[in-house]
Design a protein with these regions (language model features):
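Gly-rich Lys/Arg/Thr-decorated short loops/hinges at beta-loop-alpha junctions or inter-strand turns
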Residues: 16-22, 44, 48, 112-121, ...
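N-terminal amphipathic, basic-rich helices that act as targeting or association modules
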Residues: 6-92, 257, 261
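Conserved thiamine diphosphate
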Residues: 141-147, 193-267
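Conserved small/polar residues in nucleotide/adenosyl-binding loops
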Residues: 283-290
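A glycine-rich helix N-cap at a beta->alpha junction
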Residues: 172-180
Length: 290
């Protein structure tokens, strides 16, 4: 990830970003070009919001995730629901609104939040926080043939509405991916080689296949099955604070590095075709706005 110490005053050179008119264009890139695309997207976001005003922090924290999600999923057929509209600035830029991004918060300009009437890529009109899981749950249940993703921050997860939706998700078990965008030290302390290694294992199809076949066999031996399940849960708890997700019936992966677009595409890509509710947490450095 390229780090910027100040907001660019001149229009940056962004050849890769300039080639992206719709998310489908991202799929034409080589995977090793995604990091460069994310760097260009971050620099362009800094430049445009620096000129027009707006909220930088939330958008900067999801640059790599935005690139990864649109690279992996088939938008707008698949649904991406953003919690807190300020996260959606990068999403707007790569969904055909790059030239208009400077009009955010201006008369007759782009909305500062996702708006359904503005773009087919904005699947839910969001403003305030903590609504994404509920909205995404309804979409996932209503149309199970689509992939549905909710992106929610750690602050928004403290609201009762989010927990209620999380509990309901565990009960209904739809094909829904919940991504927790976290910049708090309580999770970031766990980010490292061991955490990333296990995250890749738990998100792999090989692990899922072994787990599924092993479960069928071990269920015939109740005492052994419960022991193995407990060990698995404890191992996940040692390297990732996902106990609450697991207890509510969601498969939990993470935390992973939210500034590593290759790791995001690998882990989330592996989860794409899994059945049932999945949850991933990722950490990032929060931008300081002045």
């Amino acid at each position: 990830m390229k780090v910027f110490s100040e907001i660019p005053k001149d229009l940056p050179n962004t050849p890769l970003l300039d080639s992206i008119n719709i998310p489908e264009d991202i799929k034409k890139l080589n995977k090793n070009q995604l990091t460069a695309l994310a760097d260009e997207l971050r620099e362009f976001l800094l430049y445009t919001v620096g000129k027009s005003g707006g909220h930088l922090g939330a958008g900067l924290g999801v640059v790599e995730l935005t690139v990864a999600l649109h690279y992996i999923f088939d938008t707008p057929k698949d649904n991406i629901v953003w919690d807190v509209g300020h996260q959606a600035y990068p999403h707007k830029i790569i969904t055909g609104r790059k030239k208009e991004i400077e009009t955010i918060r201006k008369k007759d300009g782009l909305a500062p939040f996702p708006r359904r009437s503005e773009s087919e890529y904005d699947v839910f009109g969001v403003g305030h926080s903590s609504t994404s899981i509920s909205a995404a749950l309804g979409m996932a249940v209503g149309n199970p043939n689509k992939k549905t993703i909710a992106v929610i921050g750690d602050g928004a997860m403290t609201a009762g509405m989010a927990f209620e939706a999380l509990s309901h998700t565990g009960h209904l078990k739809p094909n829904l991916l919940i991504i927790l965008n976290d910049n708090d030290m309580s999770i970031s302390e766990n980010v490292g080689g061991l955490s990333n290694y296990f995250a890749r294992i738990w998100a792999s199809k090989l692990y899922k296949g072994i787990k599924k076949s092993g479960k069928s066999f071990l269920e015939k031996l109740p005492q052994t099955y419960h022991l193995v399940r407990k060990v698995e849960t404890q191992m996940k708890g040692m390297v990732a604070p996902g106990t609450i997700f697991e207890e509510l019936g969601l498969n939990y992966i993470g935390p992973i590095d939210g500034h590593d677009v290759n790791e995001l595409t690998e882990v989330i890509g592996n989860l794409k075709d899994f059945d049932g509710p999945q949850s991933v947490s990722y950490t990032h450095l929060r931008a300081h706005e002045t």
